[in-house]
Amino acid sequence: MKNPNHPSVDQSDRVVPYNLRQSGRTPTELLISTRVRKSPFWHLSHEAGCWRATVYNRIYHPRGYVRPEDGGAMVEYEALVNRVTMWNVAVERQIRVKGPDAEAFTDYVITRDATKIEPGNGKYAILCNDKGGILNDPVLLRLTEDEFWFSISDSDLLLWMQGVNISKKYDVEIDEIDVCPLQIQGPLSEDLMAKLAGEELRDVPYYGLMETSIGGADVVISQTGFTGEKGYEIYVRDAHENAEIIWNAVLEAGKEFGLMVIAPAHHRRIQAGILSCLLYTSPSPRDVEE
């Protein structure tokens, strides 16, 4: 007898048990609770038209602004590849490693050589468990000799990193800080960011950092993104106080460039060959091997 979970090549007779179905709508109403965090940009995303969201890093994550009847995700895509867009990516929680042994600890937990990352620069980083499984793939920012920020993807990296140093072998503080990023992505992003941060912004290299202020609020800017387009991230310090200042400043400056607030553009990410951690990776090397 043919197993119903072993379909034919064309998948036309595929049957997936209910307990394995990860896609599709949930036929229940989900309750809002303090177990899932609302970011400092959450209400601003709603004002911008956010109509659907998911949960990422235990934070509500906007995933759509243009409704299907108005063109949906392809309208957002058009704005991204032709003009400039702003994304609420506060779900990229910021884990700070600071102290005399910050470089040594960071070098221990990532797979690349942290000693080669100069202050004022960032790198894409991978963190693995003792079996070689991928735990997280943050953008790693080195602000100073003794301070690194891990801009993390979706996993409890803070607890893992604190656990790695439970013996206090490394003289560092490991904590989550009140910093939330926005992404500014698209071919006109450099012009918009130069208007906000000054012409020196144009000298920031790929994965380079710039510390400045916008509207009186302190920020760190990196030339990074999730699209393959030219783009930047604005890391807002003291985000719960300064989120509206930065958001509104970007909206105002962006009018000239046709700025649109959109959701993270996975269609463009796929075109660019950029992986999304835990969609294509796993803490279990066996999952990747199979």
Which ranges hold each PLM region?
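N-terminal low-complexity segments that are often proline-rich with Ser/Thr-Pro
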Residues: 288-290
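Glycine/proline-enriched, intrinsically flexible loops and inter-domain linkers
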Residues: 2-282, 286
